[in-house]
Amino acid sequence: MMENFKHTTVLLDEAVNGLNIRPDGIYIDGTFGRGGHSRLILSQLGEEGRLLAIDRDPQAIAVAQTINDPRFSIIHGPFSALADYVAERELTGKIDGILLDLGVSSPQLDDAERGFSFMRDGPLDMRMDPTRGQSAAEWLQTAEEADIAWVLKTFGEERFAKRIARAIVERNREQPMTRTKELAEVVAAATPVKDKFKHPATRTFQAVRIWVNSELEEIEQALKSSLSVLAPGGRLSIISFHSLEDRIVKRFMREQSRGPQIPAGLPMTEAQLKKLGGRELRALGKLMPGEKEVAENPRARSSVLRIAERTNA
């Protein structure tokens, strides 16, 4: 039985407004979650509008299946495959907007059985889709010490990555860890300098979660796919929650807004320039939550919304 964990959608109005909804448009909510963005999009669509929602979490799919609306459809899978979902429906180049709310959701964090949080003891799982791939416990029990250290450093920006990785491997050698509390305790004991404002396991849990779910690769693939999926004038509205996510989104929008970089003085014909094409996107800026939203929902504090528009190139 699925418990009803509350989820407060971050930057709800701003993200949907960023899509510049047309009543007859076709939109994608790539991270359905508990449906906050999807329901607001549906409220702004007319009878001819369509919304395609995606999520790889079975609990999110169960919530989505309660929406009885002919304009709405839900797909169980990763948003990195959005180009395939769109092609199957013969909608390539016809999508008017894509919304992505990246990272882990509040219901996932709050449900101890999902294993995402060091604040609640539960199975050491961390998979967005518990039916596929390796759990965090399975990966940590089989990975080399150097690989664990690399993941902690790369995806958690953990300064004590090597020390923590060694402690994890030694603990698993004695008795394999299967619980979130066990991992949190091992990390805390291996951390020589404590941050009074942050739990010592914060960065480790983030890094392992990102690795287990291939989160950054998912984002990069979805962004790349968006260029073929969006119609001219179609919008990208993307919320990120930490610097690694935002860096990828920011870099992508910046690069696609510049167009091809041609060395100064390189002789090229008009035909060659035309073949290279122009810029693919027009960056429309970023937004961050206001003081009121952060006060009501502290998890919104680190969120950043970036919006871009598909050009006619």
Swiss-Prot record:
This is Ribosomal RNA small subunit methyltransferase H. S-adenosyl-L-methionine binds at residues 35-37, 55, 79, 101, 108. The gene is rsmH. Transmembrane segments: none annotated. Its main location: cytoplasm. One of its GO terms (cellular component) is cytoplasm. It comes from the Bacteria. HAMAP family: 16SrRNA_methyltr_H. One of its GO terms (molecular function) is rRNA (cytosine-N4-)-methyltransferase activity. It is found in: Cytoplasm. Belongs to the methyltransferase superfamily. RsmH family. Keywords: Cytoplasm, Methyltransferase, rRNA processing, S-adenosyl-L-methionine, Transferase. It catalyses: cytidine(1402) in 16S rRNA + S-adenosyl-L-methionine = N(4)-methylcytidine(1402) in 16S rRNA + S-adenosyl-L-homocysteine + H(+). Specifically methylates the N4 position of cytidine in position 1402 (C1402) of 16S rRNA. One of its GO terms (biological process) is rRNA base methylation. It is an enzyme of class 2 (transferase). Its EC number is 2.1.1.199.
